[in-house]
Every structure is written in C-alpha cells, then in structure tokens.
C-alpha cells in the first residue's frame, strides 16, 4: 500500500510518500480502507508519535493522521458491531500508526457509521474535533442552557464544533476569531464574536461560566480573569513551561475515542444541527502542501482513495 511515512523526529519536511506493508488485523481489530484522513499538525509534538505506552521510543517509520473516514475492509474474528463493507469514521489509538495510508487499523469502539449526509472528505475532519468539543463542554464543563461560554479559536477545527455544540445546548456563546471569520463564526451560532487582533477579550468579557481554550499561552493565562467565581476553564493547549502549574494541569485534557459520542455527533450532523468545516482537500501525494497551507477555517484533508 501507499503511505506517508515519518522517518525521523521532525516536522512535515521529514515525511515521505512511499510503499509500506499493508497491516493485518488482529483478533479484536478492524482494517479500514481509508478514503480521507484529516491533517492535525500538532501530531508532530504529541508524545505518542514518538513513544510507546511504556515510555520507550517507537521505531520509525511512523504513520500520522489519527482521524479518518473509509470503509471496513476486514475484521478480526473477535470483532463485533462492524461488518466488512460498512462506511465508518473514527480514530486510531494514539500509540499505533494512523490513517495517512491506503489502510489503517483500529478497533470497533473507536469507529461509528459515517454520517449519511457527508462525503468521506467531510467526515474525516469530524472525529477528533467534534469529540474534543463534546468532551470539553459536556463531559468536563457540564455546559447547560443559559450559561455563558467563551470559545477561543472559534473558526478552527475544535472551535467550530464547540460553537455549534454550545449553541445547540442553548448557551450564550462568545467567540474569539479574526475579523475575516466573524460572520462565519456567527453563522455557526456565536452570539458575540471578538476580533482577537484588535480587542483584548478581557476588556469586554467577564463572568463567564466556561472557557474553552484551543490556543494556549497568553490567551489561556488571560482567560482565568474572565471566569465567574466557580467557573471552569478547559484547555487542549498545554506548553511545557506552564504545564507545571497545577491549575493548567487540571484544566488540560486529551480527547479519547468514544463510539457512543461519535454516533450522537453523527446523528446531529445528519439532522443539520452541526456541520464539519473543511479547509482544503489535497490528493495524498500533495501531503506536504496539506501541512504547510494552514487553513483559515477548519482542517485540511488528504483524499486517499476513490470511493
């Protein structure tokens, strides 16, 4: 099969497009014929990209791209809940090879039926971003009707789903984005959009119940001051310098695969409640452009196979 391989520690410049062995599913694994995989540039900084769960180094080459859409090509004898030929979307375990290849391995608990209303390229940007938004706002912050939520990076992959989900939960949604994306973010359901380039959000926002930070650094540090007493900040951006601070560690989380949540997200998408935001779609062999051309909205996607 063809795959995009990371042969050494580095960034997109360390990727190559080469032949690789087609994976074989174990008893509890699903082999997916990948049709689209989303680009997540932060994978180059993820711990699991270069380490095994025991802390030892992962051998190279490594395949990135841990959210995908495709069709089940084979299943192990112990698999239940999926059948060969099913159109699915989902995630891989962080510590195994990803989906920037013709085929990838996962487990039944990490995939769900692809939303019927979406093409594979659209579905591929959903799993990580939508589950991150869900687990941040619903599982951790317990966002409820009437609460005020501030979402940083609202035009991005996670932020765009978070705005839509918070709007669906009937919260009052305040978002930060560029002026160029203000109307777009309002269209997703934001009640107020702050141009982060011209207006310090802390100058116009106070007493929010929840902050979802997808940016980190100074943006996160300034966000503590706009929370009401007892409010909650949730962040997916943690830098080493600040991660030593207890409140940053407590606010940080990493998304986990969740089939039930994927099914609910799929239902909401097919009902028109939420929609994915795709930056640009690139053929697999143009993978370097997909990484280097940062989208103004959503995530870029690799088109890997023809349906």
Task: Name these PLM-found stretches.
Residues 33, 262-307:
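C-terminal hydrophobic helical "lid"/dimerization subdomain
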Residues 231-280:
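Rossmann-fold dehydrogenase core element
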Residues 21-39, 51-95:
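Glycine-rich beta-strand-centered segment in the early N-terminal region that forms part
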Residues 174, 186-251:
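Glycine-rich cofactor phosphate-binding loops and adjacent beta1-alpha1 units
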Residues 67, 116-119, 142-148:
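Short helix-loop-beta connector
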Residues 84, 124-195:
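Mid-domain Rossmann-like dinucleotide-binding core that forms the NAD(H)/NADP(H) cofactor-binding site
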Residues 95-108:
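A structural motif shared across PLP-dependent enzymes of the aminotransferase-like
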């Amino acid at each position: 099969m063809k795959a995009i391989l990371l042969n050494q520690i580095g960034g997109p410049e360390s990727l190559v497009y080469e032949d690789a062995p087609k994976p074989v599913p174990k008893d509890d694994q699903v082999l997916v014929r990948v049709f689209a995989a989303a680009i997540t540039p932060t994978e180059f900084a993820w711990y699991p990209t270069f380490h095994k769960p025991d802390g030892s180094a992962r051998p190279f080459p490594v395949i990135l791209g841990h959210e995908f859409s495709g069709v089940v090509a084979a299943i192990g004898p112990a698999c239940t809940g999926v059948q060969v030929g099913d159109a699915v979307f989902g995630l891989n375990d962080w510590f195994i090879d990803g989906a920037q290849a013709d085929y990838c391995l996962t487990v039944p608990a990490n995939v769900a039926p692809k939303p019927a209303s979406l093409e594979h390229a659209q579905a591929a940007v959903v799993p990580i971003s939508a589950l991150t938004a869900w687990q941040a706002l619903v599982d951790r912050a317990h966002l409820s009707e009437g609460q005020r939520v501030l979402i940083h990076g609202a035009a991005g992959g996670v932020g765009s789903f978070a705005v839509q989900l918070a709007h669906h939960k009937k919260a009052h949604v305040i978002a930060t984005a560029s002026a160029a994306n203000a109307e777009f973010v309002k269209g997703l359901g934001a009640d107020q959009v702050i141009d982060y380039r011209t207006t310090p959000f802390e100058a116009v926002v106070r007493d929010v119940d929840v902050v979802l930070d997808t940016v980190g650094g100074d943006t996160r540090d300034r966000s503590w001051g706009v929370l009401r007493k007892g409010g909650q900040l949730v962040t997916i951006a943690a830098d080493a310098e600040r991660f030593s601070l207890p409140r940053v560690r407590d606010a940080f989380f990493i998304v986990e695969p969740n089939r039930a949540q994927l099914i609910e997200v799929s239902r909401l998408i097919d009902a028109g409640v939420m929609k994915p935001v795709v930056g640009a779609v690139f053929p697999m062999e143009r993978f370097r452009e997909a990484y280097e051309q940062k989208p103004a909205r959503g995530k870029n996607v690799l088109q890997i196979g023809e349906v």
